[in-house]
Amino acid sequence: MDISRKTDYALRMLAMLAEDPERLLSVRTAAEEVNVPYSFARSIQHGLVQAGIVESLRGVHGGIRLKVSPDDVTIRQVVEAVQGPMVMNDCTAPDGDCARMGTCCYHPLWAGAQALMRDYLDSVSLGDIVAHRQFPAVDSKFADRDAFPEYATCTCACREE
């Protein structure tokens, strides 16, 4: 799982919009303010519009603005809007193909890590980040080791038979 530069730029652009939710911002201005090439910013805009996070208005006075409250946009939604589904390993992808599915000792590890990452990023909203730039809200369950899910006992000895 890699958080791409595209996601980083998307979050910066969204932070600008979240500071003034009624503000209509041209993509060119957003690109200049976060120091990203215009064509790259347009690609980011497309993903955010498709996800319903921002709306795009055409015309000489057009631009983008948040379509929903910053408090209703999770960081996971942004990540998945610009870079697709979050997966820790190919075997945990929605259409993942693994020849060892059902016998691999590591699949539960990757699936658990993926679930924790998704839950964590779902627990933090764009509003949390904008309001608390240095201290984003973190669900306390992530600090509690007892809250981690349990997995079936591995019986494959983690090697090919």
Where are these regions (language model features)?
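A short alpha-helical element within helix-turn-helix/winged-helix DNA-binding domains
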Residues: 28-35
